[in-house]
Curated annotation (Swiss-Prot):
GO terms for biological process: cell division; cell wall organization; peptidoglycan biosynthetic process; regulation of cell shape. It comes from the Bacteria. ATP binds at residues 134-140. NCBIfam families: murD. GO terms for cellular component: cytoplasm. This is UDP-N-acetylmuramoylalanine--D-glutamate ligase. It comes from Thiobacillus denitrificans (strain ATCC 25259 / T1).
């Protein structure tokens, strides 16, 4: 694939951060002729050995970023964990150095490829993009959209924040390891969107907004502005009627489709009518048919319908895709039934909004909820109402246990402390009654106690399995 129009050959590019995304950037840029080096503020970046093995020509610099080093580059490529406000980055940008991220490089490459396809003697259709962001539900909606597009007969690549970095996905296609997709379905974080300006998605959504990453953003307005960058193109805007902050992102003159847990205001919007998913006034499918429970998943399904329908795909195929969607790991995932109590892993619930949705999604069932970890500067106040309405008890772990305890103190629900997650499982087992749920939905990041949210889930599931074995022996 020819990217001469991007003028990468010989360009001095410095990649900042050597996680999965940084490594993918270094690899893709090197293949396409850039003079690549990598800098990471950590003394021992996670992929240092892999970089040396697979890209020995790429120099690695470790330790604090130096302004002069960054300013000497033609282009900075920022990993999601490196903010534009990083002083050395800000100084380089002020001196005229371009700063982009992997999604921006992908968007530019895709524009070149689509232009080349259109210029062929027998023009080929452009590859389309569905782009998804939001505080909660991103991965679920992304996976739903991928399944629904496949059910409609399209070749699909799902990538981005959901797992496979976009440039790794593009590299696999360039190497012939995967087919060229008809549609890209991308999950994008606010961190990625900060450095993205050229993405022109066929349909894009900001699913919802609640406090998250307040250790990175000065306020909710800055966080929302980063999310809104997903609408930089000309495609359909998909917005949540139940979230005023996302509705405010509607751009005059753009095609807007909304979704919400109410009746549809117009014929092209999606909503709920008498416990059925509906498009305008047309009933589409009973909510009970969805394999993923809870009203938050009803909202996810409606968003996915709005996004995929924007590609003019047949509604029957999209509904079949929804019916077959079984959910994702660590998103209110059932782990076990023990003595009449159902245990759920929602380790991916890393902010207050996600935990609120998980608790309300329990319906009439009371839950013993395990909360705590690294709160990322969030306001835990909104948890109080959800705890009061749905929790039998709260078990607290991690760095911000004290802050959460203070926020829910007046909820009328007792809270308990645990030193470890296995201890929390034991306490929850004693507190839960038959017919209850035990829900790990921490409302926090995991890095104070675990490698990541997956590691936290593994520890939880292991503890639940041990509990099940012990109860079976009694």
């Amino acid at each position: 694939m020819n990217y001469d129009a991007l003028q990468l050959s010989g360009r001095k590019v410095l990649v900042l951060g050597l996680g999965d995304t940084g490594l993918s950037c270094a690899r893709w840029l090197s293949v396409h002729g850039a003079d690549v080096s990598v800098a990471d503020s950590r003394e021992a970046p996670p992929h240092a050995a892999r970089l040396a093995e697979t890209l020995p020509q790429v120099a690695l610099f470790t330790g604090p970023f130096e302004a002069a080093h960054l300013a000497a580059a033609d282009m900075l490529v920022l990993s999601p964990g490196v903010p534009l406000s990083e002083p050395a980055v800000a100084q380089a940008v002020a001196q005229g150095v371009e700063a982009v991220g992997d999604v921006e490089l992908f968007a530019r490459a895709l524009a070149v490829l689509n232009a080349q396809r259109a210029a062929l003697p027998a023009p080929q259709a452009a590859m389309r993009v569905i782009a998804i962001t939001g505080s909660n539900g991103k991965s679920t909606v992304t996976a739903m959209c991928g399944d629904m597009c496949r059910m409609a007969g399209l070749t699909v690549c799902v990538a981005g924040n959901i797992g496979l970095p976009v440039l790794d996905a593009l590299h696999e296609i360039e190497q012939g390891a995967a087919p060229l997709p008809q549609v890209w379905v991308l999950e994008l974080s606010s961190f990625q969107l900060e450095t993205t300006s050229s993405l022109d998605a066929t349909a894009a959504a900001v699913l919802n907004l609640s406090e998250d990453h307040m250790d990175r953003y000065p306020d909710m307005a800055a966080y929302a502005a980063a999310k809104a960058r997903i609408f930089s193109g000309n495609g359909v805007q998909v917005l949540n009627r139940d979230d005023p902050r996302t509705l405010a992102m509607a751009i005059p003159g753009r095609h807007v489709v909304s979704f919400g847990l109410d009746r549809c205001p117009t014929d092209e919007n999606f909503g709920l009518c008498e416990d059925e998913l509906c498009l305008g006034g047309d009933m589409l499918m009973p909510l009970s048919v969805l394999a993923v429970p809870g009203l938050h998943n009803a909202a996810n399904a409606l968003a996915a319908l709005a996004l995929t329908r924007a590609l003019d795909l047949p509604i029957e195929a999209l509904l079949r895709g929804l019916m077959h969607f079984k959910g994702l790991p660590h998103r209110v995932e059932k782990v076990a039934d023990i003595d009449g109590v159902t245990w759920y892993d929602d380790s991916k619930g890393t902010n207050v909004g996600a935990t609120e949705a998980a608790l309300y999604g329990m319906g009439r069932r009371k839950a013993v909820v395990i909360l705590g970890g690294d709160g990322k500067g969030q306001d835990f106040g909104p948890l109080k109402a959800a705890v009061a309405a749905n929790a039998r008890a709260v078990v607290l772990i991690g760095r911000d246990a004290v802050a959460i305890e203070a926020a829910i103190e007046d909820s009328g629900v007792a809270s308990y402390r645990a030193d470890t997650l296995p201890d929390a499982v034991e306490q929850a087992a004693r507190l839960a009654e038959p017919g209850d749920a035990v829900l790990l939905s921490p409302a926090c990041a995991s890095f104070d106690m675990f490698r990541n949210y997956v590691h936290r889930a593994e520890v939880f599931v292991d503890a639940v399995k041990k509990l099940a074995a012990q109860r079976a022996q009694v």
